[in-house]
Amino acid sequence: MPPERTPRQRIIQLITGGRLSSYQLAQMLGIPERQVEEHLPHIVKTVARDPSRRFILEPSVCQDCGFIFRDRTKLTRPGRCPTCRSEGIAAPRYGIESR
């Protein structure tokens, strides 16, 4: 990737056509996972302005009971499951698809 691109541009490029977690994005970009999570709401707004693309959020899932966090508005991983109180939660994955 060219170094002159901003982190948001690089994240958009990586998640276009695929789905990655914030941890995977952080590893690929060499930046902290928290920083990736701070960029995501801005990326959602950028993609929403483009009618030819849409942001996809694969929600977090509890690894113990299978609860799916469908109604969650935050883009980060939840701390624990509201059903079984387990902390084993699969991270959400993000992607961008063409309409």
Region locations from a protein language model:
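Short alpha-helical segments that sit at the start of domains
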Residues: 1-9, 70, 99
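Short capping segments at the starts of secondary-structure elements
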Residues: 17-24
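Alpha-helical residues within the helix-turn-helix
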Residues: 27
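Charge-enriched amphipathic alpha-helical scaffolds
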Residues: 32-54
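Short, flexible, mixed-charge glycine/proline-rich loop motifs
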Residues: 49-59, 69-75
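Short cysteine-rich clusters marking metal-coordination/redox-active sites
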Residues: 61-65, 81-84
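Cys/His-rich metal-chelating microdomains
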Residues: 68, 87
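Short metal-binding segments enriched for Cys and/or His
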Residues: 88-99
